[in-house]
């Protein structure tokens, strides 16, 4: 049998499917998620149910978002899960997670994410950060390093700044390729994202922050002065106490927010 077949389902490359099969890893992830009935539990990409089954055992209801119609059909007919699941068939990148919110209940979101959409999905989920208590995701290890990087690191970039603006980022565990079927060609890791109830560095307009970060990191090897010359002057960098001869990966989240707020003030 092909090593891409698990429980009778053939993994689809276009959906980035790698199914988690290591029981010890599954137990550790479920322990980190800490499922309960005090939150709206949401799984992205339940696949063949490796995380779905143990989480559903611990709660009255679990909402899942799955793109693959074949897997949705399996879940609808699952002898144990079908009565506990609320299933949304569709693309998580387009899904309105806000519709799942319940008064007085924040969401706990988790999933073994397809690596080919993990970064854009992070940016999409940040839009709903105020309605989310925790997020736990299996990601390519490289992405977890980017999420948790510090200024000055090679991994530090636009994703780092935006993730750490919205959330506290905590790497949980590393997961080797043999924990999956089929085995991916890269190492994986689980990360915990804890959205801030009160942001440490509030931004006046997140759209401006997002645009500023994109512009700054488009040419990583060039200086802030070069990359942001159409947004901030040398005098304004000086007012902020930021050395404009530095490269974008040398600038802290707090400094990016300060730059974005100055741009907002100029527009006002």
From Swiss-Prot:
<feature type="binding site">
    <location>
        <position position="91"/>
    </location>
    <ligand>
        <name>S-adenosyl-L-methionine</name>
    </ligand>
</feature>
<dbReference type="InterPro" id="IPR020598">
    <property type="entry name" value="rRNA_Ade_methylase_Trfase_N"/>
</dbReference>
<dbReference type="GO" id="GO:0003723">
    <property type="term" value="F:RNA binding"/>
</dbReference>
<keyword id="KW-0694">RNA-binding</keyword>
<dbReference type="InterPro" id="IPR023165">
    <property type="entry name" value="rRNA_Ade_diMease-like_C"/>
</dbReference>
<dbReference type="GO" id="GO:0005829">
    <property type="term" value="C:cytosol"/>
</dbReference>
<dbReference type="InterPro" id="IPR011530">
    <property type="entry name" value="rRNA_adenine_dimethylase"/>
</dbReference>
<dbReference type="InterPro" id="IPR020596">
    <property type="entry name" value="rRNA_Ade_Mease_Trfase_CS"/>
</dbReference>
<protein>
    <recommendedName>
        <fullName>Ribosomal RNA small subunit methyltransferase A</fullName>
        <ecNumber>2.1.1.182</ecNumber>
    </recommendedName>
</protein>
<comment type="function">
    <text>Specifically dimethylates two adjacent adenosines (A1518 and A1519) in the loop of a conserved hairpin near the 3'-end of 16S rRNA in the 30S particle. May play a critical role in biogenesis of 30S subunits.</text>
</comment>
<feature type="binding site">
    <location>
        <position position="20"/>
    </location>
    <ligand>
        <name>S-adenosyl-L-methionine</name>
    </ligand>
</feature>
<feature type="binding site">
    <location>
        <position position="18"/>
    </location>
    <ligand>
        <name>S-adenosyl-L-methionine</name>
    </ligand>
</feature>
<keyword id="KW-0808">Transferase</keyword>
<dbReference type="InterPro" id="IPR029063">
    <property type="entry name" value="SAM-dependent_MTases_sf"/>
</dbReference>
<keyword id="KW-0963">Cytoplasm</keyword>
<feature type="binding site">
    <location>
        <position position="66"/>
    </location>
    <ligand>
        <name>S-adenosyl-L-methionine</name>
    </ligand>
</feature>
<dbReference type="Pfam" id="PF00398">
    <property type="entry name" value="RrnaAD"/>
</dbReference>
<comment type="similarity">
    <text>Belongs to the class I-like SAM-binding methyltransferase superfamily. rRNA adenine N(6)-methyltransferase family. RsmA subfamily.</text>
</comment>
<dbReference type="InterPro" id="IPR001737">
    <property type="entry name" value="KsgA/Erm"/>
</dbReference>
<keyword id="KW-0698">rRNA processing</keyword>
<keyword id="KW-0489">Methyltransferase</keyword>
<keyword id="KW-0949">S-adenosyl-L-methionine</keyword>
<dbReference type="GO" id="GO:0052908">
    <property type="term" value="F:16S rRNA (adenine(1518)-N(6)/adenine(1519)-N(6))-dimethyltransferase activity"/>
</dbReference>
<feature type="binding site">
    <location>
        <position position="112"/>
    </location>
    <ligand>
        <name>S-adenosyl-L-methionine</name>
    </ligand>
</feature>
<feature type="binding site">
    <location>
        <position position="45"/>
    </location>
    <ligand>
        <name>S-adenosyl-L-methionine</name>
    </ligand>
</feature>
């Amino acid at each position: 049998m092909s090593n891409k077949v698990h429980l009778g389902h053939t993994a689809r490359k276009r959906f980035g499917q790698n199914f988690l099969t290591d029981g010890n890893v599954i137990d550790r992830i479920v322990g980190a998620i800490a499922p309960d009935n005090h939150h709206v539990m949401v799984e992205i990409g339940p696949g063949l149910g490796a995380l779905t089954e143990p989480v559903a055992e611990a709660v009255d209801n679990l909402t899942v978002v799955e793109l693959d119609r074949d897997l949705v059909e399996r879940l609808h007919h699952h002898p144990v899960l079908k009565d506990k699941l609320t299933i949304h068939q569709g693309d998580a990148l387009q899904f309105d997670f806000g519709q799942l919110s319940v008064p007085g209940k924040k969401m706990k979101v988790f999933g073994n994410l397809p690596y080919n959409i993990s970064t854009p999905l992070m940016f999409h989920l940040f839009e709903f950060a105020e309605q989310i208590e925790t997020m736990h995701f299996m990601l390519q290890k490289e992405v977890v390093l980017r999420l948790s990087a510090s200024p000055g690191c090679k991994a530090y970039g636009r994703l780092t700044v935006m993730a750490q603006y919205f959330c506290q980022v905590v790497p949980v565990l590393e997961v080797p390729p043999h924990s999956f079927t089929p085995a991916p060609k890269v190492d994986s890791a689980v990360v915990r994202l804890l959205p801030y109830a009160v942001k440490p560095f509030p931004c006046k307009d997140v759209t401006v922050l997002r645009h500023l970060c994109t512009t700054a990191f488009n040419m990583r090897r060039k200086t802030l002065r070069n990359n942001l010359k159409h947004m901030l002057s040398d005098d304004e960098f000086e007012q902020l106490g930021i050395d404009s001869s530095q490269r974008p990966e040398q600038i802290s989240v707090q400094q990016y927010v300060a730059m974005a707020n100055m741009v907002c003030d100029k527009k006002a």
